């Protein structure tokens, strides 16, 4: 009996072991599948998954839905998907950031990771690929930016002498602008102020960059400045040129637009290159720089010489024209757009215009013109400027960014080399921060004592933040203050009653008011402006 049991036991044990192994293996596979499904569901529910977003259509993705007013489309999607979501433009995945928290976490807390630019075709066209604004983030780019920023400040806001020179340029162009506007409004006429405003602002930047100005009827200068809107449409968020490259393969409006874009960039670059070459030829060794172009050339030549004390942080000489192109091109377009907004808001809100004028009359008086030293004593004027920037959000979406590494924003995973759109408009129109954000109300920036609420003013997002923050922000705010203060002090602005009071816009990199007509009249006479300009050194016109 014992022998029999001993003989059968190995077979039984072997059979049992095989069955157990099979069952265990099957159970393990089922458990692994079940666990995998559970983990997948948990992963999808976790905040570190990819950002959500709308369904993308084949070939075009969500491009057809973006439309011209991309910032409004993004704001609508943010209400549905949250402040971080993903769309697809053609085959290009794009993460869109909305709201102060998401944008700050990305651009400020992770500035270097979000500082790159996408490899878009249009970006490579600007300044032959050497653009500071559109160039890739690198050590070379950081050197280029530091040099551009320090030189721009040296010729604008850093020193009392440079601030005085800039005020002089602004005063001279404000005087010329007033004369042109008033003359063209003679006999009660109305005019579109767009062209005179663009020329006035461009002349200030021409004086800073090149040491010269142009007449308001200079055909070559007007032609050069006439393509600002076309440029903005091509490089703005949602532009089809970059995200649907197959459209370049056959005749269509997008390809036509891109070829025009290439030509206008060549024209603009050649304009600046001519100024650069003339400056190099006429630059006197050892002499003080006459303007910003001189300063860049001197810095680059000092670096290239390799002599003791050379400026190793300066620009390379071949980068100088592209950097000046960026500074001159971006500043004159941004400033003219902002100033047009200030004028149209003056005419649409005459009570605001009257309050600005009353504060200027009380603080400055009628026997002199406003100047930068008056700024701290003009809180309502500054409130008007900040509210105009917030309300218009004339730079609604920044130039597209790209990531340099894998990262997370608000828990969502964003891979390296992802294209990122930053919706600044969403910050400026957040009802949680700005009660009734669609109302234009400069008083929202004043505290109970009538002073500027600096914390609120600093939260207006118009010049971006982080590594790509606009280097001309300080200069822009200074010039806008000078222009609008002098204009309001000297003139009255009246809307055309035959036009609709509703404002309409054109969209691109900036939001520009469409053509509008106003009447401009002197509050008194040109005497103050004429006398002030006579004290300035006469500037030699460009040849």
Curated annotation (Swiss-Prot):
Heme binds at residue 470. InterPro entries: Cyt_P450, Cyt_P450_CS, Cyt_P450_E_grp-I, Cyt_P450_sf. The keyword Metal-binding applies. It holds the Pfam family p450. It is found in: Endoplasmic reticulum membrane; Microsome membrane; Mitochondrion. Enzyme activity is increased by cytochrome b5. Enzyme activity is increased by liposomes containing anionic phospholipids, phosphatidic acid and cardiolipin. Inhibited by naringenin with an IC(50) of 5 uM. Constitutively expressed in retinal and kidney pericytes cells. Expressed in retinal endothelial cells (at protein level). Expressed in cardiac, pulmonary and aortic endothelial cells. Constitutively expressed in trabecular meshwork of the eye (at protein level). Coiled coil: none annotated. This is Cytochrome P450 1B1. The gene is Cyp1b1.
């Amino acid at each position: 009996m014992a022998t029999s049991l001993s003989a059968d036991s190995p077979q039984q044990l072997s059979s049992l072991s095989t069955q157990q192994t099979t069952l265990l293996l099957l159970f393990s596979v089922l458990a692994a599948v079940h666990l995998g499904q559970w983990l997948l569901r948990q992963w999808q529910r976790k905040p570190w998954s990819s950002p959500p977003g709308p369904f993308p259509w084949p070939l075009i993705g969500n491009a057809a839905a973006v439309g011209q007013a991309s910032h409004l489309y993004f704001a609508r999607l943010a209400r549905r998907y949250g402040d971080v979501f993903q769309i697809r433009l053609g085959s290009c995945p794009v993460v869109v950031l909305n709201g102060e928290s998401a944008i700050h976490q990305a651009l400020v807390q992770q500035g270097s990771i979000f500082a790159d630019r996408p490899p878009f075709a249009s970006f490579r066209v600007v300044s032959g690929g050497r653009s500071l604004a559109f160039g890739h983030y690198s050590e070379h780019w950081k050197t280029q930016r530091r040099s551009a920023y320090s030189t721009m400040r040296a010729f604008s806001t850093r020193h009392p002498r440079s601030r005085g020179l800039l005020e002089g340029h602004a005063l001279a162009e404000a005087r010329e602008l007033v004369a042109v506007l008033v003359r063209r409004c003679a006999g009660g006429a109305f005019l579109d102020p767009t062209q005179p405003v663009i020329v006035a602002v461009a002349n200030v930047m021409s004086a800073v960059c090149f040491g010269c100005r142009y007449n308001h009827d200079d055909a070559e200068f007007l032609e050069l400045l006439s393509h600002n809107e076309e440029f903005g449409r091509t490089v703005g968020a949602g532009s089809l040129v970059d995200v649907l490259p197959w459209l370049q393969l056959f005749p269509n409006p997008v390809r036509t637009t891109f070829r025009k874009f290439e030509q206008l960039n060549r024209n603009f670059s050649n304009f600046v290159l001519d100024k650069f070459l003339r400056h190099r030829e006429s630059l006197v060794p050892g002499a003080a720089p006459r303007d910003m172009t001189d300063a860049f050339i001197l810095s680059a030549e000092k670096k290239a010489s390799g002599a003791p004390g050379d400026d190793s942080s300066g620009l390379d000489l071949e980068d100088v024209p592209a950097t000046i192109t960026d500074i001159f091109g971006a500043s004159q377009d941004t400033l003219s757009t902002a100033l047009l907004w200030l004028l149209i808001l003056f005419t649409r809100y005459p009570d605001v215009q009257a309050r600005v004028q009353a504060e200027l009359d009380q603080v400055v008086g009628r026997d002199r013109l406003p100047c930068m030293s008056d700024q701290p004593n003009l809180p309502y004027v500054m409130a008007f400027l900040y509210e105009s920037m917030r309300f218009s959000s004339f730079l609604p979406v920044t130039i597209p960014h790209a990531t340099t590494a894998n990262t997370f924003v608000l828990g969502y995973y964003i891979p390296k080399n992802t294209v990122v759109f930053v919706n600044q408009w969403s910050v400026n129109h957040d009802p949680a921060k700005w009660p009734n954000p669609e109302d234009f109300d400069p008083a929202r920036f004043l505290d109970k004592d009538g002073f500027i609420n600096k914390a609120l003013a600093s939260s207006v997002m118009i010049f971006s933040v982080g590594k790509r923050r606009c280097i001309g922000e300080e200069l822009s705010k200074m010039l806008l203050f000078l222009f609008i203060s002098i204009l309001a002090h000297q003139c009255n602005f009246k809307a055309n009653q035959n036009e609709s009071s509703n404002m309409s816009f054109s969209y691109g990199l900036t939001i520009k008011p469409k053509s509008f007509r106003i009447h401009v009249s002197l509050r008194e006479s040109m005497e103050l402006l004429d006398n002030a300009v006579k004290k300035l050194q006469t500037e030699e016109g460009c040849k």
